[in-house]
Amino acid sequence: MFRAMHLPLLGCLLGTSGCHGLPPAPPAPSAAVGNYGEVIDYLQRHIRREMERQDVPGLALALVDDQQLVWARGFGYADRQHRINASEHTAFHAGDLSKLLIASATLQLAERGQLSLDAPLQDTLREFYVRSRFHADQSEADRAITFRRLLSHQSGLPGEHLPPLFGERPNSLGQLPAKVSGVWLSNPPGTQVAYSNLGYELVGAAIERNTGKHFEQHMREHLLEPLQMTRSSFARNALPQAQRAHGYSGGGRPGSASDLPVNDLWSSPVDLSRFVRMLFANGRHKERQLLRKHSVEEMFRQQNAGNALDFDCQVGLAWFLSPCGSALLEGGIRHYEYASATPGFSAHLVLLPEQRLAAIVMS
C-alpha cells in the first residue's frame, strides 16, 4: 500500500525531477539540494490527494538528512473509528523492517565474540537440523546454514514453516527450533537469495539461546532503549493502544499481525529515523557506540556476489542493496531499502548511502 510514492520522496529530497514520479500532481518545485521548504509543501499536498485516491486511512513519514530529522508528519487517522489522528510518533506495525534490527543485534553479538557470522546455526541451536536433497551427507547441510547466510536470505530454508495438517505453529521462540527441525531445504545454502521469514525467526531463537534473555528484552536493552526508541517494541502489548495505529485491510476491517516477536516490531517513523541516523554515524548514537564501523560496513556489503541466479539483485546483511524488482531512482542514484506488507499495514525504509538521505513511510 502506498509504495509507489516512497522512492519519489527521495527524488524530491535530492532536488531532482524524481518528484514527477507521483502522478497526477502538478509539476514539482525545482528546489536546490538541501532546501526542503518547497518540497515539503509539495509533498503535503500530494500525500493528501494520494491517500484519498487510494483510500489510505492513516500514514506517517520521516525524512532524514544525515544526522538531521528534516521533516516528520502524520496524515489521516491512527484509529478511524474513534477519529484519533496519526502523528509522526504513532507506532505502526513495521513487520519485516524488524529484520534490520535483528541483523544489527546479531552483529553486536559477533562483536562481543558471542557468535561468529560464519558459524553454523546448529552450534547455537543444537536440536535444529534440516533435510536436503542437495547433500549426500545431511550433517553437511546442517553446517552450511550459517548466520551470514540466514541474514542475507541465502540459507536455503523455505520462506515460512508450514506445520503438518493437524499440527500447531510454535507460539514461542524457545519452541521453534525443535518444532521446525526436519524442514526440507528449498535450494542449496549459499547459492541463491530466497526470502525466508523462517530463517530470521531462527536467528531470533538463537539470540534468545545465546543471551539467556527473552528476545524482546534483549532487543529492548541493546537497541531500542539505547536509541531512545520509546514508541517501539517487539512486544505489542508493551505499547498502549492509544500509541498504536489500527490496521485496515480490504473493506476497512482491522488487520492482524504475527504471533512471534521477531515479526512483531511496532515502531514510529521518528523512532526508525534514530536507527537510520545511528547507521549514518557509523554505529554511533550520541555518546554511545552501538555498532562498530566495520559492522555497519559489513551490513551494507554485498553478500551474494557469486550467485549467478540472483542476476543484478544485491543483498547485504538484511538490506537490499539494488532494486531487486523495484524502480530505480532517476539518474541511477544508488539506494538501499527494506519494505514490509503485513495485514492492514505497510512500511518502507529507503537510504541513499552517498547522499546520507533516508525516507521512512508507514501506513
Where are the predicted features?
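Catalytic tyrosine of NAD(P)H-dependent dehydrogenase/reductases that use a Tyr as the general acid/base
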Residues: 92-95, 193-195
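Short, glycine/proline-biased beta-turn/loop segments that scaffold the active-site neighborhood
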Residues: 117-135, 226-227
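Short, surface-exposed loop or secondary-structure junction motifs
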Residues: 75-79, 132-343, 347-348
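Bacterial N-terminal signal peptides that target proteins for export
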Residues: 1-8
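Active-site SXXK
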Residues: 41-47, 61, 67, 93-121, ...
